[in-house]
């Protein structure tokens, strides 16, 4: 099948599994790299193979250098495959690498796919731990442009402004978030929105508006 169709993903994958299970590491690695560096290989197959690479690496002692090098090669071969970059970020967290390095990968994802909500949430949560309020405001403002119906980004935006003591901007963000409430909205988050709005209005002396 491989001779007839050199890009046959199923056939190449089966051959890779055969060599891998037989302990023929050299041939298995050649096939693995061939598939991972091909733009014709599906994102799902690449993710499965990279998870196997991570598993094998951890069982062999956990040296992250060759794994990260492989990730970089795969990303360079297809920069638009954000799934691989997200998996790299997850691996870096597994290896307890510095948050700033993980953040760099997530920023690369957002450069390619600015509407990737998962990458943006992960990045904001990372920055939150270091109280990087200005960066969070910037990321959240971008988020509501690309994901205007995602309430969590209005929450992040409002809370970051609130932490900066900019209550007017915080109130504006929370009000915009409330306008996105629907039947599927998280009830706890909705409650938080109204509670925070009430606190801000109370601080501003608008006790009527607070209730």
Language-model region placement:
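Alpha-solenoid helical repeat scaffolds
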Residues: 1-209
